[in-house]
């Protein structure tokens, strides 16, 4: 079996193998019978083998289609014990190798949900119960995204949404701050998408009281985009604007956004989009995730007692702890490797507390030390300050 990328969902409870429902193999699998006694269930990310003549007979009968669970038991009962047939069918159902046939189970979307380990009926119910409105701020792509979402089963509406998807040309667009305040006041979830440019972005989900807000995100992004931060702080006047600033290049960004949003809704927002930005690099053809942390001291959504930047600092309390003998000649309570593993999600050129982390090459192979390549200087107010900081 290859790596499993599924979300964990509970197994089936209904004993379908005693019903009149017609079984079919899960739509994410192509199924091969290897005589005399092996069956291969093949997908791009998972491969399974079933062994035994009973599984070969079941696979052939299910693959032909049209027979109910009850009919399968009756027909195969001529050659195999009834209890063994029931046991094999139960195993196929519990592992979701086999599902009950439905009109919508033959499509590519059904195969995708099955690849996630998500029952089709659950995905369809979640998609049906979440109304999505598309809103654009000076950027194209709204109509295309709406059509792509609808094709995946998302319920796109013009009013009374359960989720608002806002398209922008820049995540640091000043008008987004007002939208953030409104959603925080209304306690309504929303999501950002930047379909334009050569580095399109999707997410994260902003769910007031549950996740980070846009102010949390903008604080991190501004510190990682020093030049853009300067342009926003000083009276800079745009005399020419790149066509890529407000226009999509191809359909990659729109389709990525549609799939990620539909996946989040179908799984009841149990995906990385809940607390990550998904970025697409159209130059290097790579996709990356960037963690978005909820800041306890955020002036918009943080804890009331921590919002005042002039508050009295809490004293640091030192206490006894175990120490590790290190080959570097010093002592630590936690190894460098363990520290990096714990805080790796906070390393990002987009949203990280540290933009990049690199391992220090050393002659001693047991040394595992790292250094941060990050600009920790304060926000520049002039071009000269920016040059000095960089």
Residue spans for each PLM region:
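Long, charge-rich, low-complexity alpha-helical segments
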Residues: 3, 43-156, 181, 192, ...
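Structured loops at beta-to-helix junctions and adjacent beta-edge loops in soluble globular domains
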Residues: 28, 34, 44, 101, ...
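Alpha-helix N-cap recognition
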Residues: 68, 157-160, 382, 389
């Amino acid at each position: 079996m290859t790596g499993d990328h599924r979300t964990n969902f509970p197994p089936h409870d209904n004993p379908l193998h005693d019903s009149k429902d017609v079984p079919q193999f899960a739509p994410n699998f192509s199924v091969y019978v290897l005589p005399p006694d092996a069956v291969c269930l093949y997908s791009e990310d998972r491969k399974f083998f079933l062994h035994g003549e009973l599984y070969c007979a079941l696979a052939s009968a299910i693959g032909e289609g049209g027979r109910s669970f009850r009919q399968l038991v009756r027909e195969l009962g001529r050659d195999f014990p009834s209890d063994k047939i029931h046991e094999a069918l139960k195993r196929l159902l519990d592992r979701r190798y086999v599902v009950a046939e439905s009109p919508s189970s033959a499509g590519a979307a059904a195969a995708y949900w099955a690849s996630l380990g998500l029952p089709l009926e659950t995905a369809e119910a979640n998609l049906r119960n979440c109304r999505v409105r598309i809103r654009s701020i000076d950027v194209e792509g709204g109509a295309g995204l709406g059509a792509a979402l609808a094709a995946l089963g998302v319920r796109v509406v013009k009013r009374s949404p359960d989720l608002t998807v806002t398209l922008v040309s820049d995540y640091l667009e000043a008008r987004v701050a007002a939208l953030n305040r409104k959603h925080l006041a209304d306690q309504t979830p929303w999501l950002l998408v930047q379909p334009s440019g050569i580095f399109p972005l999707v997410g994260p989900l902003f769910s007031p009281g549950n996740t980070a807000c846009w102010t949390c995100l903008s604080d991190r992004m501004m510190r990682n985009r020093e030049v853009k931060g300067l342009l926003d702080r000083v009276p800079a006047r745009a005399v020419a604007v790149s066509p890529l600033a407000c226009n999509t290049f191809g359909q990659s960004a729109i389709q990525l956004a549609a799939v990620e949003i539909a996946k989040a809704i179908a799984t009841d927002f149990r995906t990385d989009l809940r607390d990550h930005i998904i970025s697409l690099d159209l130059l290097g053809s790579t996709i990356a995730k960037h963690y978005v942390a909820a800041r306890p001291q955020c002036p918009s959504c943080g804890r009331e007692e921590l919002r005042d930047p002039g508050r009295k600092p809490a004293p640091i309390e030192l206490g006894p702890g175990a120490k590790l003998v290190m080959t570097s000649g010093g002592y630590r309570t936690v190894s460098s490797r363990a520290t990096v593993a714990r805080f790796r999600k906070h390393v990002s050129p987009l949203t990280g507390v540290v933009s990049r982390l690199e391992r220090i090459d050393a002659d001693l192979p047991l040394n595992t030390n790292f250094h941060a390549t990050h600009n920790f200087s304060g926000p520049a107010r002039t071009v000269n300050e920016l040059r000095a900081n960089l």
